[in-house]
């Protein structure tokens, strides 16, 4: 998969060093994967949540943080839309 919005991940992991290893591993996994269905993501990320419009919420570091991405299964693109703390995510989703 190609990752768009990687700068958001780099910025976040720079500010939250405890998330860096997880994010680096996720990037490596996403870049070497070819996700064609939500189930293929679920197989590796059992706690991932799937929303409308191909939005996937990944729990980072035991749900301390959240990563929101839109998956374009047909083109192989992952668009990182947002990454932040679980508390920030809860506020966003209001």
Put a short name on every predicted segment.
Residues 1-64, 72-79, 86-94:
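Basic, Lys/Arg-enriched alpha-helical interface segments
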């Amino acid at each position: 998969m190609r990752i768009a919005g990687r700068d958001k991940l780099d910025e976040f992991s720079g500010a939250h060093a405890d998330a860096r290893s997880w994010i680096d591993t996720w990037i490596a996994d996403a870049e070497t994967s070819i996700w064609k269905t939500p189930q293929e993501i679920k197989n590796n990320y059992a706690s991932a949540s799937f929303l409308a419009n191909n939005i996937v919420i990944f729990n980072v570091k035991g749900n301390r943080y959240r990563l929101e991405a839109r998956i374009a299964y047909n083109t192989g693109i992952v668009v990182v839309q947002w990454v932040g703390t679980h508390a920030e995510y809860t506020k966003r989703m209001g």
